[in-house]
């Protein structure tokens, strides 16, 4: 199977999905290849999950400091299962937002590992096999 595109972007982090959208805005047929989840490292394993958990820790610390500013609260407790659940919900909401952007912009998303074979071909290896992505216009050789 060979699908044809004007632009193939490998990696669906912020740089990747923004490049894909820009390609569409310039009139290109675009494919986006990602081997994990939309959003890249920052969204899924880095900045966003870390900051979501840190926010909970900061609130916990503020609640513990309540008496020093005249605020009386019962001893706060951390429910790590709930903290993880909230983090997962935040990430899922953001991933859905990116997926919606891809759909709205008619960007074809391929989940797998993209390998550039040459200037005009990208191989996408997925669990069920491979897909070939090439140029939309046929190559003319003399």
For the regions a protein language model found, what residue spans apply to each?
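Glycine-rich flavin
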Residues: 2-5, 21-28, 33-142
């Amino acid at each position: 199977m060979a699908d044809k595109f004007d632009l193939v972007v490998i990696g669906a982090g912020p740089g990747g999905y923004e490049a894909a959208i820009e390609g569409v805005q310039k009139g290109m047929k675009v494919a986006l290849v990602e081997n994990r989840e939309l959003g890249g490292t920052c969204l899924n394993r880095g900045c966003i999950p870390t900051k979501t958990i840190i926010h909970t820790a900061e609130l916990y610390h503020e609640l513990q400091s309540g008496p020093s500013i005249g605020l009386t609260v019962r001893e706060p407790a951390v429910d790590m299962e709930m903290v993880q659940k909230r983090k997962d919900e935040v990430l899922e909401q953001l991933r859905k937002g990116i997926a919606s952007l891809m759909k709205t912009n008619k960007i074809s998303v391929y989940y797998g590992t993209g390998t550039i074979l040459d200037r005009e071909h990208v191989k996408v290896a997925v669990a069920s096999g491979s897909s070939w992505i090439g140029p939309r216009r046929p190559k003319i050789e003399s």
